[in-house]
Amino acid sequence: MNLVAPTPWGLFFQDSATPQMEGIEELHNNIMFYLTIILFSVTWMMITIIKSFVNTKSPISHKYMNHGTLIELIWTITPAVILILIAFPSFKLLYLMDEVMDPSLVIYGEGHQWYWSYQYPDFTNADGEFVEFDSYIVPESDLEEGTLRMLEVDNRVIIPELTHTRFVISAADVIHSFACPSLGIKCDAYPGRLNQSSVYLNRQGTYFGQCSEICGILHSSMPIVIQSVSLKNFYYD
């Protein structure tokens, strides 16, 4: 089983576990390709121009050059083409992420100061009530060996792999944000409003996230732990 969590001095993405996060990472890499070319091209041109002026003996060698049609066309059209090449994949990914799928499982999550509560409206307990629970951070004094400080919770969200799952997010008091980087989720939680995000986990594993909206003094004490299991274990365990 995979364990995906932040690492000290981490500079790159966490391992993606959903198609939407794979799309985000691919878009990022494509944009970085264009930005790298732009960086080196502009740097080369600036250095070339500076060296040209430094090596020119006459300080008025370009006195009568007040415009250049060709270069103006180049620096107008080239950025426009680059922006189009960036925009189309970005819009495609944006609309794919917003596409409403018919989920096999719905989980309702509500942010509180400073914990999360979850409800599985598709399941009921012996009393006929919806399955629901609260998820609090595990205090540092209660951590077991091998668990993660400021990220472990007492009750994890369990979802099956290879299943379309919809998270419906809200808040009970102030604005929160339900975020799990490896799943490509960042869903704002507003009091009195419902927001949603769909996921499709490619593999089993444990994935860590946090509240990503400053919500008070214990904002950093609202971790999110999502554990993906097989469909059989989800229904029978």
Swiss-Prot record:
Its cofactor is Cu cation. Binds a dinuclear copper A center per subunit. Residues 52-67 are mitochondrial matrix. PROSITE patterns: COX2, COX2_CUA, COX2_TM. GO terms for molecular function: copper ion binding; cytochrome-c oxidase activity. The chain crosses the membrane at residues 31-51, 68-94. Coiled coil: none annotated. One of its GO terms (cellular component) is mitochondrial inner membrane. One of its GO terms (biological process) is ATP synthesis coupled electron transport. It is found in: Mitochondrion inner membrane. Mg(2+) binds at E213. Disulfide bonds: none annotated. It catalyses: 4 Fe(II)-[cytochrome c] + O2 + 8 H(+)(in) = 4 Fe(III)-[cytochrome c] + 2 H2O + 4 H(+)(out). It is a multi-pass membrane protein. Cu cation A1 binds at H176, C211, C215, M222. Its EC number is 7.1.1.9. Cu cation A2 binds at C211, E213, C215, H219. Keywords: Copper, Electron transport, Magnesium, Membrane, Metal-binding, Mitochondrion, Mitochondrion inner membrane, Respiratory chain, Translocase, Transmembrane, Transmembrane helix, Transport. Residues 1-30, 95-237 are mitochondrial intermembrane. Component of the cytochrome c oxidase, the last enzyme in the mitochondrial electron transport chain which drives oxidative phosphorylation. The respiratory chain contains 3 multisubunit complexes succinate dehydrogenase (complex II, CII), ubiquinol-cytochrome c oxidoreductase (cytochrome b-c1 complex, complex III, CIII) and cytochrome c oxidase (complex IV, CIV), that cooperate to transfer electrons derived from NADH and succinate to molecular oxygen, creating an electrochemical gradient over the inner membrane that drives transmembrane transport and the ATP synthase. Belongs to the cytochrome c oxidase subunit 2 family. Component of the cytochrome c oxidase (complex IV, CIV), a multisubunit enzyme composed of a catalytic core of 3 subunits and several supernumerary subunits. The complex exists as a monomer or a dimer and forms supercomplexes (SCs) in the inner mitochondrial membrane with ubiquinol-cytochrome c oxidoreductase (cytochrome b-c1 complex, complex III, CIII). This is Cytochrome c oxidase subunit 2. It comes from Trichophyton rubrum (Athlete's foot fungus). The gene is COX2.
